[in-house]
């Protein structure tokens, strides 16, 4: 009972109905009719029974507490409360509302819907003996469809529902248990009511006084037991129910006790085994996420259907008495009882999963080896899971890893590779290991094996070999150069195929040093590798590499901390060398083996499936859990979204199938351009010719694009040192404050010079800047095309607008958010925030915030959002009505955090603006996913066209999500982007969300085509990358309305 709710005592001389007392006193009388919530069929009954109506009558001026009717004095005969305020006198008996059907009864009986009113219905005159005679037949008909569930024990959640109501769990309360409707109402007369017997309840004098008063009132949605819940004396529903009105000689089915004693055990017959609560996991209803716009097409994916032959997986809780702390001891004790549990188990120390059902409670005995203590092991059934339950997925993946090992694949990191199929690139001293990344997922379409082709690039050179090369090149700064080269990189030790990240180099130690083993013995590194791996260490004076693993627990309770020391001679570099990334020919040779097309990709998948299904040992391992993997790749129906129209200043056109409009962009004027009247070019003396040629080309190509470019201020530098550039730029900006743009022509890829220029132009003296590598403008045949692209980028940085698409939503703000890690302080991260300022989505506002690991990202997000809203109001003289946020950098495990923490904080931001409640859609953008899509036709797999969307079968069961491939693929497979709608009050349907997202992928002005993510996300990424990689500080606020970071 709500303590804040006022009490209304009954008028003197009026007796309150016993079922009304149960509401006020939080207890129920023993011999009164039981109240249930059956939605079953209507059966004949022997006397009027109470239901629940939404209207009722009360005597005199007594305050109305229940229902929605009006107050009226009551005559001798009762009135029935009809639906929502309709009152009707009845001569005898009554009826309630029936939403279903009424079975034929000895006399016609009427069921009525909401709001209907009917005249009196005669009370059915059926003797109890007649009902009792019919009971066995009715039970026999119902029994086959009723599942038997034991009555709950003390700790049952079913019992807790009634705790505090004074009801002892002597019988199961099922949904359809009680033969009375949804509640009690009316007054049957004092002479008809059974005398209450209170067991274990203590009533205060005030309560006793209230009970002695007289009252007539109605509670519930009906009057008699006709309608939703009336039933005869029968056991229907999810548990056994005793008779409705037990005779005084029969024990009552329920004992009424006080709230303080509600948790006592129910009396059970001698010899009855204890009952435990077993939960059955329910199947979730699918979410409405499927769109209809676009052309249907067949789509293939790297999802392989998995069939579960078992009916269920059974979850047990294992208790050790006395307690056993060591996990390894627990595993050993459970292994001794495999004859009971079976050979197929999944056990984590306390939760046990089996594919077979044991008794509800099983007691086993074991002996602790350390002190010979006898341990009692209690295995109690707690939950019955469908075989596709999310709780089963982790140990299904363990089974899958065993299968991959059976096939001869080696686990490196999280993926499996085939060392027997290695590809040697001798010219580049590289090895490519082909392999697979695999996982089992439960999606909207069921249980699937997700397989992706993976490649591991290993170098033939060990870390020691690279150290020798560095020593030959720079002996003076040898250790510093080694630290720059190795710290942060990933190495593999081939004696165990494990990968490690190098965190530091220990120069003071060598393989001749000793270390302590797990058993306490001391040995040298040389002896350790000779005894355990048969490896002879050749270089005895090499330093050691340090790997600091993240603190984590291993099975057995052992916590891994400290450092792992590795030998450079046995550690091999992984990944593509930085020098090789800049070598076009070397990268072309490598990508031939890494970037496989759709047909080759699917062939690799089919080969793996064939290997699994043709290996008896692998099939046996899967069959232990009732799993079987199909040999066919999933093919389902997707859609291709309609093409978009690109709008320039005075021209518009529909995109081509390749979604590339670079020709139209340089042929027609942009939406708006900024005249380049005062700008400066800085270049070293040896790049004078290239600088002059570039300025001339700017003048030739600017006209057709709608730009006006004046002659720049030329500043020739005597050298290309960083100090020379910075001093010259600072001097020029000081002497000529009207400079709109700084262009720097640099020789080579120099991060230090680039960072210094950007810090000066983005923080100290805010002005848009353009850095150009001299190699980019050194080829005359490509100079015109390069100049056009640079001019378009410059126009964006100055505040110009290039193109847009038609977005029908007015007063819309689209926001992009991405997070990047600051390279100067590895623990610090930077968030880029970009928001649109106009309905055409061509004006953007950008901000940056830095935060430490223990600081929530939402703190800086709130500041950026309020600033963007204020700027939007300054531009439009109104706040946006709808806000769509695209949030990048969120993994599946962080979705609930975003939903329960970030979004409420965003909503609180809106409360700071009076009378402002915008509609919000929050969409998470995921690029690093394992899903691959293929076009399919004539038994041939290809690359999907841009605009391909898939919003069912492979989607997440818990969210409204879809996969969209917005960009054009020239080589490799179709890698879509996953969009998850975490929050949506903007009334945007799945079609709206998909089409808006596709439109936003057209608006990245650095590329005249579609990109993989929405443009605001890409802008936010570029801004966060610039700030975290080079600036290490927030850019000046003067640049916030320009895309200076492109």
Swiss-Prot record:
Polar residues bias locations: 19-31
Tissue/organ expression: Detected in primordial germ cells (PGCs) from 3 dpf. In adult, it is found in both the female and male gonad. In the ovary, it is present in all stages of germ cell differentiation. In testis, it is present in mitotic and meiotic germ cells. No protein has been detected in the fully differentiated sperm cell.
Boundaries of every PAZ domain copy: 462-575
Compartments (UniProt record): Cytoplasm; Nucleus
Residues in Piwi domain copies: 741-1032
Active-site residues, record numbering mapped to chain: 818, 856, 888, 1021
PTM comment, free text: Methylated on arginine residues; required for the interaction with Tudor domain-containing protein and subsequent localization to the meiotic nuage, also named P granule.
CDD domains: PAZ_piwi_like, Piwi_piwi-like_Euk
Keyword RNA-binding part of the UniProt annotation: yes
GO (cellular component) term, any one: PET complex
Cofactor(s) needed: Mg(2+)
Self-association and partners: Component of the PET complex.
Protein name: Piwi-like protein 2
